[in-house]
Each structure stands twice: as C-alpha cells, then as structure tokens.
C-alpha cells in the first residue's frame, strides 16, 4: 500500500476549543495525572482495514507545533494565561501514546495512555482523521460543492418552516460543532464559510483553526472527561461532580461558564447544581436524553432557586440538525436564552454519505476506572461494572443500560 505523504491534520489548532480550555485547567491543576482513553465505533462499520493509514497519519502529527501566528492569536483571547501558552509552544504530539490495532473481528481498536494534559489533545484530531480517511475511500467522488449545495437546501427549508410557523428568528443562535465527524477539513471550512456569509445567526465555531482563519468567535467549555476524571481525583465519589464544577470556576471564574450536565444524568447533576453554582455558571449544555424534558427541568431548577431563566443560557448539542433546532427554539423561545450547536449534520451532511458514529472516551484516571452514565442509555460508557454500581449508589440513580 502506498501511503499518502500529505498530513490531514496540519495545525495544532485544528481541534475543538474545549480541548485547549480543558488542557489549560489540567496543566494548572492536575499536571501529573495519568489517564487512559479508548475509541468506540457505535455503528456496525468494520474500520480495521484503515489501521495502517491511520498509524501513518498519527505519526505525522508529531511534527505539529504552534506557529508564531497561532501563539499570537491565542494570546489575544481572554481565556489563556501566559504560562500555559508558553508551555503550549513546546507541546508536541507523542504518537507512542496511541496504540492502534485490529480486533479478530476486524474492528479498529485504539488505546491512548499518558499524562492527562497530553492525552487530552488526541481525541478530536484522531476522530477527524478516522472520519476523513474512511470517507476518502467510501466517497472519493464527493466534492465540497455537494456539501455546500446541501447546506443551502437545508437553510432554505429552515427559513420556509420558520416563516410558515410564524417564528421570530431574531434570537436564534447557531454554533458549528462539526470537527470530530466531518467529511473532511475542506468541507468543514467551506460549510462554516458559507454560514458566515449567508446565515446571520452563526455566532461561532468550536474549531480554533477555523475561528482564527475566518475571524469567528471560538466556542466551547468542558467535555465529559472533565467530570469523569474527577471521579478519581475527588477523595469522595459522591462529591466528585461538585468538585469538578468548583475546579472549573477556579480556573475560569468569569467566562466559559456553560456546564455539561449528563456525565451522571441530568437529575444527579441538578442535585449538585446549587444556588451558588447556578449563579456563577452562565448556563447548561444538553448532550443526551429528551431535550424538551431536559430544558424544562433546567428552567424549573433556575426558577426554584429564584433565578430568572432569561439571565441564563441553554446550549443544545445532541445530534441536532436545523429542523430539530428550530423545534426546540420554538418551544423555549422567550423563556430562556438559547444556543444550538450542530455538528455532523453540518459537516458530514452530503447525499449518499453515511456519517460515522465514533467517539473516544476516558476510561481510566490515575489508574482507576471512570464512567459516563448518560441520559441516553446507548451513550453510557463503562469499563468496570463494580465501579458503575458504586457510582450509581453515590449519586442515587437507577439502573442504566450500559454501552461497554
């Protein structure tokens, strides 16, 4: 096999913003913490045949480094401290941290281990690599124009439905969350550029490289791994979620204040999300479970705490498309501020193309298991049933179907 000498990932900033935001917090607070992350394909695709190409691309990532222009760009943002950015200039991917193999059944297996503040950077570019490699083989004739034309059709339908239903779009806000499962880097760039030029409700992108290139706000706070890791950082499992929330506020006391709610289910989250947290965080992000039920719970929680929901923001990001976002906007408009993060349905929405349902999740921290007990049973991640039972008991949650 002749391997392509052109790297797919060409910039350290070709990643989601929350990776850098979390990396800074880990660098400052947990710099000696070892972790393990693993790849999951939730679909039925056999991806093992691409292992050699993937390894080749991973090896080339060792050459990536923050450029002077990228350093200056990050320095201009309010999120980052000088000590972290100085260290980031020295950061290099270490391909030896990534073990790529093929199971007897032909599945792709990826095991990533090392210090958390280094391992944290692998997830997004690895998933983007896998997605682009597979689509190159499955859909070699698809073009960027196909993706942009499809987007234009979807936007037209969006406007038609909004007009037909008399929906005031003045408060609608969209963010691009499409890096991880994009068809290709070129498609993501073209789609976000199209939105920037022709969809006035776009308020940002999660991709730092695109944010820099297109002059868009970078968006993103923290991911499940932040809460998962604290299950083994906190001395008490029952207080681990509160410790994760508090530690984030110490790093970012006045910004990046959208909290992810579904690492251990929304109900367990709200029990920990007391008046002080609700006051200090700007809002909440939905990533699993029924979005309407979730939003109603969030609004009721704010009201119970005496907080006006119109001073807070809900971010919806679970498998959204334009029509789902419009339906949620119609339901919650004028009751709470809303933002919609659309990912795969923006950057891998091409007729005839099946997006991959792939993830990389934390499975260990400090040599011990961690778990994600999602509001969607199929999204639950576990490696150790005994630990899952301890987690359920600590947070008083019922039996959850596990996706191990």
Swiss-Prot record:
Pfam families: NAPRTase, NAPRTase_N. Pathway: Cofactor biosynthesis; NAD(+) biosynthesis; nicotinate D-ribonucleotide from nicotinate: step 1/1. One of its GO terms (biological process) is NAD biosynthetic process via the salvage pathway. Its EC number is 6.3.4.21. GO terms for cellular component: cytosol. Signal peptide: none annotated. It comes from the Bacteria. Belongs to the NAPRTase family. NCBIfam families: NAPRTase (TIGR01514), PRK05321.1 (NF003704). Catalyzes the synthesis of beta-nicotinate D-ribonucleotide from nicotinate and 5-phospho-D-ribose 1-phosphate at the expense of ATP. This is Nicotinate phosphoribosyltransferase. It comes from Photorhabdus laumondii subsp. laumondii (strain DSM 15139 / CIP 105565 / TT01).
